[in-house]
Amino acid sequence: MPKGKKAKGKKVAPAPSVAKKHEAKKVVNPLFEKRPKNFGIGQDIQPKRDLTRFVKWPRYIRLQRQRSILYKRLKVPPAINQFTQALDRQTATQLFKLAHKYRPETKQEKKKRLLARAEQKAAGKGDAPTKRPPVLRAGVNTITSLVENKKAQLVVIAHDVDPIELVIFLPALCRKMGVPYCIVKGKARLGRLVHRKTCTSVAFTQTNPEDKGALAKLVEAIKTNYNDRYEEIRRHWGGGILGPKSTARINKLEKAKAKELATKLG
């Protein structure tokens, strides 16, 4: 073989036509036309998305949402922030169970009682004065005077009073006068106890002898959670939680700073 000439490789014979795979062509129905959607402005109807953020809510809902966001974003002073720490569910259930026994009478019950008493008097059976049963006392002014006179055994305050200024002083007053207090969820729930729509606060003044043990247990648990922790509660600020946009912006700036520092050092 002369130098400089390369030997040519043998060519492989092409595969027979039988061995070739016949790709099945997709049968396209000419009646079905392709109509790609255009989601530009003024074109096709937009796909379903979660547009909750853009809904024009009723005014009262808008205020609720704004208030909750402001409480997260702004720095909330301890006096207001303490109302976010409600009583735990188990203790609250026991408390409401006991409070249910001391609900004040309704207008219908009072009418029925007075009618029975009047009938008794008319029958000539005499009108002996009856002892007032122990019931819950409700309302800020009533409870303030009870606490000041140290007549309240336990004060229950609602966490969602609006405006909060109505009850903001009560925890400090209760602690000063040595009265056990607690914060529970729901002014509406307290309202149901005293036959009203809502109620800012209720207080126990007297209880029946059979319930004194249950009340003493509750008072002990509540004192541990609220009265004894007053100094800790007084120092604890709330809020200051940034939103997702602000957090993302801060993270982006920090990444850029870290990158810049790395290039300077490297």
Curated annotation (Swiss-Prot):
UniProt keyword Cell membrane, yes or no: no
GO BP terms in the entry: ribosome biogenesis
InterPro entries xref list: eL8/uL1-like (IPR050257), Ribosomal_eL30-like_sf (IPR029064), Ribosomal_eL8-like_CS (IPR004037), Ribosomal_eL8/eL30/eS12/Gad45 (IPR004038), Ribosomal_eL8/Nhp2 (IPR018492), Ribosomal_eL8_euk (IPR001921)
Gene Ontology terms, MF aspect: RNA binding
Major subcellular location class: cytoplasm
Disulfide bonds: none
Protein name in the entry: Large ribosomal subunit protein eL8
